[in-house]
């Protein structure tokens, strides 16, 4: 990112912070000290600043064991809008949160839903830029964590297959089970798109993508984040193959086990 872009991003974040108010949370350092207070990211010093009363301390990223930032106002409402298919209405709030919480945990989470909102409204380029704003600060966000699947969907929508494949390979090797499972779901999406949703493509998407997630990622720690989408997309493929009974079984499992998931509402 150029110096001018960094300055512009910092100024935007400051302006947004004035609207959203102080950002509060707790940073736990590698030596076990918990520093709680008003937290900001210093672009100049490339460090976290924690203000407590009239004092402010700096903590380098290398010293951080865990960071827990309080949820931004309006975040849940904006996410709910995206999940209900009202992405356009959520874009301003999510964009403000992503800018204000740069380096502060919620930039990735808001960036994910911001990208999904743009994709939902047919603005894949804007979705890609929303992801890249976060990835510029943390390259691992391109293949690991909450933002990555939205980034992959933007790349798929724009036909950026070489870049997409590179990120999926990294996800598979990352050691992070969510990312590896999400990469398999994306494999299914790629196969379906390239095969124009033909019967052959549906079969391959099931065996190489969705069903692998269903059977290999059903442990309680990760299933809730991966299975609803994989089950939904597997049901779609079974419908394509004329196997309505198996499709219904997938949908029943979503409604039974993941009733709170937006995929259950679909």
PLM features: what roles do these ranges have?
Residues 1-9:
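Bacterial N-terminal signal peptides that target proteins for export
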Residues 8-17:
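Bacterial N-terminal signal peptides
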Residues 20-136, 149, 186, 196-201, ...:
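Compositionally biased alpha-helical segments
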Residues 55-58, 97-109, 135-147, 158, ...:
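Short solvent-exposed coil/turn linkers within tandem alpha-helical repeat scaffolds
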Residues 90, 127, 164, 202, ...:
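Single-residue signature of alpha-solenoid repeat helices
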Residues 94, 131, 168, 206, ...:
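Hydrophobic/aromatic packing residues within the alpha-helices of TPR/SEL1-like helical repeat arrays
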Residues 153-196:
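Eukaryotic tandem repeat interaction scaffolds
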């Amino acid at each position: 990112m150029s110096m001018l872009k960094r300055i512009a991003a910092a100024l935007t974040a400051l302006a947004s912070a004035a609207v959203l108010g102080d950002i509060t949370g707790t940073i736990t350092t590698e030596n076990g000290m918990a520093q709680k207070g008003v937290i900001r990211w210093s672009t100049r010093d490339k460090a976290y600043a924690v203000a407590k009363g009239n004092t402010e301390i700096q903590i380098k990223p290398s010293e951080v064991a865990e960071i827990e930032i309080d949820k931004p106002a309006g975040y849940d409402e904006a996410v709910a809008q995206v999940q209900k298919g009202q992405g356009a209405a959520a874009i301003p709030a999510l964009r403000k949160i992503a800018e204000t919480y740069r380096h502060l945990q919620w930039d990735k989470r808001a960036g994910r839903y911001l990208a999904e909102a743009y994709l939902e409204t047919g603005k894949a380029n804007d979705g890609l830029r929303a992801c890249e704003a976060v990835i510029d600060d943390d390259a691992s966000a391109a293949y690991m964590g909450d933002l990555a699947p939205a980034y992959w969907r933007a790349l798929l929508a724009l036909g950026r297959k070489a870049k997409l494949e590179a990120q999926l390979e990294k996800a598979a090797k990352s050691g992070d089970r969510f990312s590896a499972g999400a990469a398999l779901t994306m494999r299914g999406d790629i196969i379906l798109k390239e095969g124009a949703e033909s019967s052959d493509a549906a079969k391959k998407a099931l065996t190489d993508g969705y069903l692998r997630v269903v059977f290999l990622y059903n442990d309680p720690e990760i299933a809730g984040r991966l299975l609803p989408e994989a089950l939904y997309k597997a049901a779609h493929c079974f419908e394509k193959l004329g196997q309505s009974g198996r499709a219904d079984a997938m949908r029943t499992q979503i409604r039974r086990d993941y009733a709170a998931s937006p995929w259950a509402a679909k």
